[in-house]
Curated annotation (Swiss-Prot):
This is Leucyl/phenylalanyl-tRNA--protein transferase. Pfam families: Leu_Phe_trans. It comes from the Bacteria. It comes from Chromobacterium violaceum (strain ATCC 12472 / DSM 30191 / JCM 1249 / CCUG 213 / NBRC 12614 / NCIMB 9131 / NCTC 9757 / MK). Coiled coil: none annotated. The lineage of its organism: Bacteria, Pseudomonadati, Pseudomonadota, Betaproteobacteria, Neisseriales.
């Protein structure tokens, strides 16, 4: 059994999260900005499907990206050099979320339900949720979004409409956040896609200790002022 959350944004200790399913900690509550930010600051995130109650997770081990461990394959490096593209931040946040929510091959549905879209758009409006976007030929070709607290970034989801478009946004995000003093990016759960870019699993204790250190630091001024245009020679 897992606890059902009350009206206050208070969570049980993450040490109480289940092993099966990995990381399930609590259910219920709401998707208010206050509750979501409290959750992220404690290493917890919401993840549920349409028709389910709100479920809160803190898996162990945890998938993270340390920016200095970013891997860029030869083919991706070639794309970075030879493709005409533009990277923008926060120019189309709702569109990025809706694109991430679109059904994908082999999946019956999406966890980015309308309530989640509304909740994260509210976080974006108050400066806590951000998108990194790849634009090609004037069109949104791929990107990702996540939540930022202090010098901690929590990646949520990504999408591609063109080959490698989400990877382009990811590489620029990692390099930019590293320049801003971010030392760890939360990727939540293991995927081969993220592992190919250098993300890896770490223990819950290491994750929480690093998170605690990062969230207490104020963000640098103009942290989200980023724009890059690449034209192949």
């Amino acid at each position: 059994m897992i606890p059902w959350l009350g009206p206050e944004p208070v969570f049980p200790p993450v040490s109480q999260a289940l092993s099966h399913p990995n990381g399930l900690l609590a259910a219920g509550g709401d998707l208010s900005s206050r509750r979501i930010l409290t959750a992220y600051s404690e290493g917890i995130f919401p993840w549920f499907s349409d028709g389910e109650p709100i479920l809160w997770w803190s898996p162990a081990p945890r998938m993270v990206m340390f920016p200095d461990e970013l891997k860029v394959s030869r083919s991706l490096a070639k794309t970075l050099r030879n493709l005409d593209y533009e990277i923008r931040v926060d120019s189309a946040f709702p569109e990025v979320m809706r694109a991430c929510a679109e059904p994908r091959a082999g999946q019956d549905g999406t966890w980015i339900v309308p309530e989640m879209v509304a909740a994260y758009c509210r976080l974006h409006q108050i400066g806590y949720a951000h998108s990194f976007e790849t634009w090609i030929d004037g069109e949104l070709a791929g990107g990702l979004y996540g939540v930022s607290i202090g010098r901690m970034f929590y990646g949520e989801s990504m999408f591609s409409r063109r080959r490698d478009a989400s990877k382009l946004a990811f590489v620029h995000m990692v390099r930019h956040l590293q320049a801003q003093g971010v030392t760890m990016i939360d990727c939540q759960m293991h995927t081969e896609h993220l592992a190919s870019l250098g993300a890896r699993l770490i223990s819950r204790d290491v994750f929480l200790a690093t998170l605690k250190e990062n969230v207490r630091h104020p963000q640098p001024d103009r942290m989200w002022d980023y724009h890059y245009r690449h034209e192949s020679s």
